[in-house]
Amino acid sequence: GSEMCIRDRQVNMFRGSANSLLRNDGYHFIFLGTFIERADNSARLLDVKYFVLLPTADYIGGNLDNLQWIILLRSLSSFRAFRWAYEGDVTSSKIAHFFILNNDCSRSLSFCINNIVYHLNSLKCSPEKITDIYSGLKKVHSSVKTENIESIIDYGLHEYVTNFVSNITYLDSQIQNHFFK
């Protein structure tokens, strides 16, 4: 009800304010945090769907599995975007590709990492100061650049996402240690 309207209005006010800021370090830190959090949350939701929600492996590819994938798309406000991006049947591998490797999906891990790279590179600080940050970022960035969805699924989606979350958490702690301590 009204609490939702108030929250939505506050979110929109923040977005409007953030998008009208000077493109200085404050702006880049806001969006650096935004994309780190978005990547972490998207990865965790993908992992929960894939690893936790399905009762047993026997259900993979069945009606319950497909319904849960569609619910994941809707929960991330991405169902329509997915349908525009992919033709044919809604499959788990297409949805995994959409949320991991699709650079046009604002919720995808790849999109988030590309924006993290952009905002980190835009900070006005000496490159030596952020060398450690780049080493952590390199791991995460290369995983969304060099992989294809088949190799991720063969490796194990849960394992891939778990590694991604670990790497993004490490990156976040490196940024905190270098800039805020």
Please name every model-derived segment.
Residues 2, 6-181:
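Alpha-helical transmembrane segments and their helix-helix packing motifs
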